[in-house]
């Protein structure tokens, strides 16, 4: 019984986040509440093969900074982060 409580406590430190790209491709992450978003951004960029500095990450319509964490953004389990690729120029 004590093991169940300890395990539930460990799970409470983590959050599941879904990152959705422009092409509707989904990447799921399980991170700690205190993990910096810079780490998640880099991991997403590595998985998709795109340079992290050309990507824009948004949560609830607001841009995510590298020093943000799921805790500072008040994220909950299964929240969605949207990813857009930077566009330059055009008419």
From Swiss-Prot:
Gene Ontology CC annotation, any one: cytoplasm
A family per Pfam: Rad60-SLD
Protein keywords: Chromosome, Cytoplasm, Cytoskeleton, Developmental protein, Isopeptide bond, Nucleus, Ubl conjugation pathway
PROSITE patterns referenced in this protein's UniProt entry, alphabetically: UBIQUITIN_2
Propeptide section residues: 91
GO molecular function: identical protein binding; protein tag activity; ubiquitin-like protein ligase binding
Claim: Oxidoreductase is one of the keywords in the record: no
Sequence ranges assigned to domain Ubiquitin-like in this UniProt record: 13-91
Post-translational modification remark: Cleavage of precursor form by ulp-1 is necessary for function.
Primary location recorded for the protein, binned into one broad class: cytoplasm
Record-listed cross-link Glycyl lysine isopeptide (Gly-Lys) (interchain with K-? in acceptor proteins), residues: 90
Family annotation (SUPFAM superfamilies): Ubiquitin-like (SSF54236)
Disulfide bonds: none
CDD domains referenced in this protein's UniProt entry, alphabetically: Ubl_SUMO1
Disruption phenotype: RNAi-mediated knockdown reduces survival. RNAi-mediated knockdown disrupts tail tip morphogenesis resulting in retention of the pointed larval tail tip in adult males (also known as the Lep phenotype). RNAi-mediated knockdown causes chromosome misalignment and anaphase bridges during the first embryonic mitotic division. RNAi-mediated knockdown results in impaired locomotion in 23% of animals. RNAi-mediated knockdown results in ectopic expression of egl-17 in multiple vulva precursor cells and a moderate increase in phosphorylation of mpk-1.
Location(s) in or outside the cell: Cytoplasm; Nucleus; Cytoplasm, Cytoskeleton, Spindle; Chromosome
SMART domains hit by this protein: UBQ (SM00213)
Function noted in UniProt: Ubiquitin-like protein which can be covalently attached to target lysines as a monomer. Does not seem to be involved in protein degradation and may function as an antagonist of ubiquitin in the degradation process. Plays a role in a number of cellular processes such as nuclear transport, DNA replication and repair, mitosis and signal transduction. Covalent attachment to its substrates requires prior activation by the E1 complex aos-1-uba-2 and linkage to the E2 enzyme ubc-9, and can be promoted by an E3 ligase such as gei-17.
Family to which the UniProt record says this protein belongs: Belongs to the ubiquitin family. SUMO subfamily.
Subunit composition and interactions: Covalently attached to tbx-2. Covalently attached to lin-1. Covalently attached to lin-11. Covalently attached to sop-2. Covalently attached to bet-1.
Protein name (record): Small ubiquitin-related modifier
Organism: Caenorhabditis elegans
Gene, per the UniProt record: smo-1
């Amino acid at each position: 019984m004590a093991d169940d409580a300890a395990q539930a406590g460990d799970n409470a430190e983590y959050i599941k986040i879904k990152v959705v790209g422009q092409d509707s491709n989904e990447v799921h992450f399980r991170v700690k509440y205190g993990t910096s978003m810079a780490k998640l951004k880099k991991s997403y960029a590595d998985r998709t093969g795109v340079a992290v500095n050309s990507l824009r990450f948004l949560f609830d319509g607001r841009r995510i900074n590298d020093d943000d964490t799921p805790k500072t953004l008040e994220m909950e389990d299964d929240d969605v982060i949207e990813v857009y690729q930077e566009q330059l120029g055009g008419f």
